[in-house]
Structure formats: C-alpha cells, structure tokens
C-alpha cells in the first residue's frame, strides 16, 4: 500500500492542497490512518477517489451530489450508493444533451461579422 500525505495526494492527483483539504472538510475524502503528529495518511483508493471527484466536478457535477455518493460508499450502503450513482448518471446525461445543443448552436453561428449597420438609414 502506498501512503500519501495531503501534499503528496494533491501532487499525484494534479490538484492543490487547498482542494484536498476542502474535500476532506466536505467528507469527500477520508484518511485511512494518522501519523503520531496527527497528519492524515491516504492510500491508493483515496487517490482514485480524488481523481474521480475532481473529474466529476470539472464535468459540472456539484460537490453536494458527490458528497452524497461518497457518504453512501463510506457507509457501505449499497442501495444508497446505487441510488446516488443513478442520480449522477442522470446529471451526466443532461450535461451531454446540453453540450450537444450548444454544439449545434455553435455550428449554426455565422463566422462573418454582421452587416446590420449598413442596412440602417
């Protein structure tokens, strides 16, 4: 097992230490052990979760929804985790639809400057 400090976890996930600490406060991450000095230690599973949470957040999934999923996973609540995963899948599908609509709108946008001023008296 690899043991990560907050700073090493942040570095390996490509995020700031502040993000890791924020996720800890929100319950998105939990240390698996503590040093004698009281510092949290994390394992590879925590690194995977951090990468997942960050990717989901970057994709537009809110931290509250992600926290509900993480709480269900941490509580070994299979039904709760399944329900939260279903919610996340719905959010992802809505994002896909919104992005597809935006893509169509972008494709329809004119690339030349508008000639409105010339037609005014």
Swiss-Prot record:
Any one GO MF annotation of this record: DNA binding
The answer to whether keyword DNA-binding applies is: yes
Residues annotated to bind DNA: 6-25
Tell me any Pfam family this protein matches: MerR_1
Ranges where the HTH merR-type domain occurs: 3-72
| Keyword DNA-binding annotated | yes
What are the record keywords, sorted?
DNA-binding, Mercuric resistance, Plasmid, Transcription, Transcription regulation
PROSITE patterns for the chain? HTH_MERR_2
What's a single GO BP term from this record?
A: response to mercury ion
Q: What is this protein called?
A: HTH-type transcriptional regulator MerD
Q: Which species expresses this protein natively? A: Acinetobacter calcoaceticus
């Amino acid at each position: 097992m690899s043991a990560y400090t907050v700073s090493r976890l942040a570095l390996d996930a490509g995020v700031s230490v502040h993000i890791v600490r924020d996720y800890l406060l929100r319950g998105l991450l939990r240390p698996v052990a503590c040093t004698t000095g009281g510092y949290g230690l994390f394992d590879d599973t925590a690194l995977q979760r951090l990468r997942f949470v960050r990717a989901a957040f970057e994709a537009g999934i809110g931290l509250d929804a992600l926290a509900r999923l993480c709480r269900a996973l941490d509580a070994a609540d299979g039904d709760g985790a399944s329900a939260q995963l279903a919610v996340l899948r719905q959010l992802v599908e809505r994002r896909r639809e919104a992005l597809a609509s935006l893509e169509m709108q972008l494709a329809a946008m004119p690339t030349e400057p508008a000639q409105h001023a010339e037609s005014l008296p």
